[in-house]
Each structure stands twice: as structure tokens, then as C-alpha cells.
């Protein structure tokens, strides 16, 4: 039997990291067991669902490298099918019309609140006669369709992450609403729990992997599966992603959408790598930097933690920096060029750009760090106070004069790393000036401060861009 998993996002907002991690776990498990990864867009919330959010979700999945195996389906295209299954439940007596008004429901909840009871429908219209139904309809009352839930029933299933889960029928909030309100004998638009069951069955889904906030929905859906004589999939409920305070990560925590992570300068490979370990503790991994293919080979749902997973910026930043350090210079330059173009910076050659990428990548945490790291190589920086103080030293000024004179006298030399070292050594020995003074003086001239990337490699780049002398001259 073919193994089939799905991601079923609602397009009511930007692609969220919680949904992205659910997608990743589904994709990884599908790869591990040789199954298929499918997409279903749950867009039956017509007021909040937007096509641009659907597009954003699919683009985010592509960016993360999570390819789906079949054309995505939209739940809104299947409303008539959902209604036909509601009709079946009505005909077999598993569901009924409920004419309780919104005001009556509010009154019931208020009474329950006063008594300290949880909100729960009283199923008052479960046994209406045909005459009573016709009376309500003639009065212009609208009805929802409710699914009967036996309060004495115990729903049990084996969760691949949490083991056996039990849920009491009496704790499910009363008979379940399957459809929105409609007039007469019409059936309103289907609601989440009914549509999910019908569509998972239609798609032949064998494994449902989703967040722990769906556990109560699973209990309700199992009852619908059984009433419709559908085969049950295997369920797995992943832990929530928590913020630093141990609360569910939300938009209030600032960055939550995949777009925002991309714009901040995180690589898709790094974000996927981090998300895989967010709630999963593999027993067989001997390192933390792994490709999606490597992760899929060792991924095991049973090793996912039950407790919530705290989001760590520090860990994500470290993983991202490792990916940048190990990235091929040509690929990194391709990415960095987008930032350079935005600032109007043009490297003198591709080779020069490759050398710069190799020089600064070890200092980068985010891709956008390339802006600050690259800037001194395109624009001559202002000399900072500590640099100005250092240049007040007589030996510092002398060092720069001697280096400049050498460059002028040897105008025909092509300066590379070896030649740069030779110049420093020769001047130091000939004029009895410490190498440290010479190099610090150059660093101030090049970067405007006493800190910066490798000086010798930087000098080679400044020489190639023909700005090394200009930078030295401004300090004299």
C-alpha cells in the first residue's frame, strides 16, 4: 500500500514557521518510508482565505526545498462532495439539524460560565420530530448540521509520537457542528472537521502528521471516519514551537513568517536544518549540520519530543553561519551581488568578488551581513577615533609614508599576498619598525579602525581595485 502524507495549510496569512516545520516533518517522513508528500489548501474560510497567501505558502515550500509529488488540491473545489457526505450522515442518523440560534448559544454559555462549567452544547435538538423541524423552518430559523457524539464513548488511538491517547466523548464540547447555517432543508458550507476527513479519505492519506493543538480534533475526526466507514490513517502530533518564555510562538514574537526569515538573510538549507532539530532528538546523528537528504535517512517520528520546543535564535544563527562558511564562493557571490546591486556597488572582476566572498564569509552570520562586511571594500570608510589616535603616533605616519613610497617606486609590481608580506618584512627590517605598527597603520588606512578582516588578503583586494594608495594618502 502506498504511503501518503499531506500538508493542509489554511491560506489566511503568510507561511508561518510552525506550518513550515509541520511540512518539513511530513516531507522527511515521506522520504524515509518511500511515500508521497501532498498539498491540500484548506480555503473554506472564505472571509480570511486569500489567493496571495496560497501563493506565498507554495513559494515558501519551494524555497525550503520541499517538493510535493502531486498537483495541490483546494478544499473549496470540493464543497459539493463535502455536502454529499453530510447528507449521508443525516440519512443514516449520525447527524441532525440543529436550529439553536446564536443568542440561545450565548445564553447557554453564559449560564455555564456562571456555574464554572466549560462551554458545551446541550444537544437540545438531537431528537426533533419532522413536525418540529418543519415548524422551525416555517418560522425562518436557520440550521446547522450537528454530528452526534456519545458522551460515554472513549476514543483511543496509537499516536506515533505520544503513544496511546484516550479522549472521552463527554469532553468534546457536545455534538459537533459539521456545517454553517443554512435556510430550509439546505446544507450550509462544510466546516473543518468534516472537510478534513472527507478530503484525507479522497487523497488516500495514510499518515497524518500535525501539531498537538489538533489532538482534540483528531478525537472528533475519528468518530466521523468511523461513521463514514473510512479507513483510519496513522496519527502523529508534534510539539508546539515555543518562544523564550515557554509560550506558543506567535506573531507577537516579531519574526514568524518564512518570508521574514528569508529577508533577514537566512539560507533555506540552514532554516530547514534547524527546524528539523526543533523538537526532534535523533539518536543516530553525530553532527548537527545535515542536508535534507541526510536528515531524511535517519528521521524517525518516534524520536520527536512530546514537550514543546523552544525556538533559539542563537542556535539558528550558528547553523546559518556554518552554511555560509561552507558555501562555494561563486554561489555566495551570486547572492551577495543582490545586496551590492541595491547599494550601487560593482566589483572590478568576478575573481575579485570571489576573493572577497572567501575573505568575509567566516565573519558572516546572516547573508545581509555581507553589506557591512563588503562596504569598506567599495567605499572608503571614515577614520574612527581610535584610528585617529593611533595615527598620532610618529611611527604610524612614518609606516604609511614608507609603504606609499615603496608602492610608488615599484609601480610596476603586481601586489599579491606574497608580495604584501614581502613589503612589510622589508620595510620592518630596513627601518627597524615593528611589523605590528606597520600592519595596524595599514589597517587604519584601509578600514578606518584597528579591527577588520585579514589585512594581507584585504590589501591584495584593495590593490586590485586600485584604491590602496588612495586610502594610504588620505592619512598623510
UniProtKB/Swiss-Prot annotation:
GO CC entries: cytosol
One of the GO BP terms on file: glutamyl-tRNA aminoacylation
One Gene Ontology term of the molecular function aspect: ATP binding
Enzyme class of the recorded protein, top EC level: ligase
Broad class of the protein's primary localization: cytoplasm
Catalytic reaction annotation: tRNA(Glu) + L-glutamate + ATP = L-glutamyl-tRNA(Glu) + AMP + diphosphate
Keyword Transcription included in the entry's annotation: no
Subcellular location: Cytoplasm
Motif, 'KMSKS' region: chain positions: 248-252
Keywords: Aminoacyl-tRNA synthetase, ATP-binding, Cytoplasm, Ligase, Nucleotide-binding, Protein biosynthesis
EC annotation from Swiss-Prot or TrEMBL: 6.1.1.17
Motif 'HIGH' region boundaries: 9-19
List of residues binding ATP: 251
PANTHER family: GLUTAMATE--TRNA LIGASE, GLUTAMATE--TRNA LIGASE, MITOCHONDRIAL-RELATED
Subunit details: Monomer.
Function: Catalyzes the attachment of glutamate to tRNA(Glu) in a two-step reaction: glutamate is first activated by ATP to form Glu-AMP and then transferred to the acceptor end of tRNA(Glu).
Record family assignment: Belongs to the class-I aminoacyl-tRNA synthetase family. Glutamate--tRNA ligase type 1 subfamily.
Protein known as: Glutamate--tRNA ligase
Organism: Prochlorococcus marinus (strain AS9601)
